Amino acid sequence: MKLTVILAVLIGTFVLGCSSTAPAPNATAIPEPTPIPTATAVPEPTTVPIATAVPAPTLLPAATVVPTPTHVPNPLSVNIHPTSCSSPEIGISKKWVETLESANFTKCVRPFGVLIGAADGIPDVYIAQAAKIAAEILDPDMDGEPNDSTVFQLVSDYTTAWIPMPTDRNSWISGGVEDELGQKLRSYGLQLPQWWMIGDTEFGDLNPDQYAKAVMVEEIIHFMTQFGYSRAYPEIFGVESWNSLIAKETKRASCDWWQHPENDCPNNPRLYGDCSDPDCDVTEFYHQVLVTKAGMEPGWLGIGFPTTPEELDLKLSPALKAAMEQPKYNQINKPLVFSYPNRAVTVR
């Protein structure tokens, strides 16, 4: 009993002790952290599109510059009668007049601006015939206007090329007159000399015969091809390389049905000289093609060259025939009449 009381007292004391324990102080409240202001959103930079690389342009070969005719009188005289080179009708510079006269080239004519300058001994009728041929090639319908304005501009620039008609072979070649004129005038002279037209004879009082006309046609076509059509349409009529249509045709025909006597072929060497460059071989070949196809007879024929239009037609490639027959190229397609009328017109 006593033990029970003691235990009860102890238990009560323990309970009181526990109940008298001071309550634990509340934990200091940790303040909520001051919110850090949200940074202003920096917008994503606008995406700059990457520029598409522009490839460098492919360099194309520079087109041949078409020169403006120099000193072409207006209205342009299509007068086919020769006159003094100093005449206003001719319209060449004073330097040219003086240089020509110093070499005894005193007579000139300019059909559609093409300068033909003749030595004093060339009869007027020969000069006039050459002028008529040049005019008819440029204006085959003879309406007073050149059919191809681009070719007209090219061949009427006498500071690039002209047609001299010398009389004395010795002074022209051996005496250096040809070279001297070339150096002073800086223009290519595609010659139409007396000795090619009539040989070593004298002119007399007769008009040019068929052979003399054929020589005129050949040299004037050479002139028109080399300084006109070749530069206006180099991909078709070019004679400066072997890349044009007529140059490739020349190569195709070479040593088959065409050989210039100054060029070599297997088992048939050249007779003299050298005409292997395109500006010679192609020019010579195309003259014979053009003249024969138009129904005329060349002054001479290359070795193996067809003698009739029908034979030639069987030899020519379809591509060349098609090009020659296109109206825009204004190639002669019928025999010349050799009688271009005298007139003066304004060429635009």
Model-derived segments and their meaning:
Residues 289-348:
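Pan-zinc metallopeptidase signature
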Residues 228-302:
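Post-HExxH zinc-binding segment in Zn-dependent metallohydrolases
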Residues 17-76, 83:
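Ser/Thr-rich, Proline-interspersed low-complexity disordered segments
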Residues 7-15:
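Bacterial N-terminal signal peptides
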Residues 102-104, 111-257:
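Acidic/His-rich structured neighborhood in mature extracellular/periplasmic domains
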Residues 118-122, 205-212, 271-283, 302-312:
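Conserved aromatic-histidine-acidic binding/catalytic patches
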Residues 1-5:
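Positively charged n-region of N-terminal signal peptides that target proteins for export
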Residues 73-110, 144, 253-259:
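A domain-level signal for the mature, folded cores of soluble proteins
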